[in-house]
Design a protein with these regions (language model features):
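Surface-exposed molecular-recognition determinants
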Residues: 1-353
Length: 353
């Protein structure tokens, strides 16, 4: 049996670095093939002292609509931000969030299945855009404020879920298998995980639905969107590691060379850390990091919270700091996506880093 069914992760996830110019732009992926529409697109300013929010758009909501993952703001319509999702990339307007002149930007894009289709597996009907082979599902639904289930279409158990009411004022509820079904994080906050049965109704997701309780963090009585990820060997992994509070930090085995890693201390008020291989190409002990819960640029993250010695290796990642934000004495959760599996479907190893 093949180690992984995904030989080329860029068929399902890509990263693009680009420069703003105060104008609308068509942004093409660096890869030469033209068959990876980013149905989930996340953009962040990398540079500058005047800070700009993160931006997330998705194909169900459609172009011209976006959310800010570092705030509680409502979904906004504006053609000058994310405009279209294209087969070889995406188009943007000239807004500061995505194309301020003399700024650098990073975009992360996941493939699902376009504008989606209806799903009635749960108590709450949903519209689902899903790619089962890559374990990525975008779900649009209307929350009820009462305990319920919602269909996701993955055909596998999601291990990482991020949801947001499209209305103003609600946080980004975040489920991670490593925390269990009684806890939740908020993507837009540095707080540790909260414990409450009203988050996920004390129920672990199944291969067809996930459960929500009565908390507005996870089931606000409003139009909402959720992004769900199931683990795929050699392509994605959502796990935990224990910090050792030592400069020789833990090695986390993934089974692939990571291209994107998100880390959060599950127990205390530490910021989220997000690194990728396009912005950090050399394992030089100073990973270029961004925080989903702040609008800080890379330089501001470093100034405010110091360097992040994190090596992205051929089979996982290695923490090389005793900093409490990613290697204190507690438990940390992570989400990671692959640049390449350790071996492909023909048992050929990838190159070590």
């Amino acid at each position: 049996m093949a180690y992984s069914t995904i030989d080329d992760p860029t068929n399902f996830f890509r990263i693009k670095l680009y420069n703003g110019n105060n104008n609308a732009q068509n942004i093409a992926w660096d890869e030469t093939d033209t068959n990876m529409q980013p149905d989930l697109l996340w953009i962040k300013t990398r540079s500058g002292n005047t800070v700009f929010n993160h931006v997330i758009g998705n194909a169900i909501s459609g172009g011209d609509k976006y959310l800010h993952p570092n705030t509680t703001a409502a979904e906004t319509s504006n053609a000058n931000v994310i405009h279209t999702f294209n087969s070889n990339g995406f188009s943007i307007g000239g807004a500061t969030f995505v194309s301020e002149g003399a700024r650098t930007y990073v975009a992360w894009g996941w493939k699902a299945n376009g504008s989606g289709s209806s799903n009635s597996n749960g108590n709450i009907s949903s519209t689902v855009s899903v790619d089962q082979s890559a374990g990525c599902s975008i779900v649009s639904y209307t929350g009820t404020g009462s305990a319920a289930t919602i269909g996701h279409g993955l055909g596998a158990i999601p291990k990482f879920i991020i949801n947001k009411s499209k209305a103003d004022g609600e946080h980004w509820g975040t489920y991670h298998e490593g925390l269990g079904n009684g806890k939740a994080l908020a993507l837009n906050l540095h707080d540790g995980a909260g414990t409450n049965s009203s988050y996920w109704n004390n129920t672990t997701p199944t291969d067809s639905v996930w459960s929500v309780g009565t908390s507005p963090l996870t089931n606000d009585n409003s139009a909402s969107v959720a992004f769900l990820f199931a683990e795929k060997k050699g392509y994605s992994k959502f796990g935990t590691y224990s910090g050792n509070n030592n400069a020789d930090g833990p090695f986390v085995y993934l089974g692939f060379r990571p291209t994107w890693v998100l880390i959060k201390d599950g127990g205390s008020g530490q910021h989220w850390h997000l690194v990728d291989s396009k912005r950090d190409v050399g394992n030089d002990g100073d990973a270029q990091q961004l925080s989903p819960n702040t609008d800080d640029s890379e330089a501001e993250v470093k100034s405010n919270r110091g360097t992040l010695p994190l090596d992205l290796l051929s089979n996982g990642f290695k923490v090389r700091t005793d900093g409490s934000s990613c290697n204190g004495t507690g438990s940390f959760v992570y989400a990671a996506f692959a640049e390449s599996p350790i071996v492909n479907s023909e048992s050929i190893p990838n190159n070590a880093r």
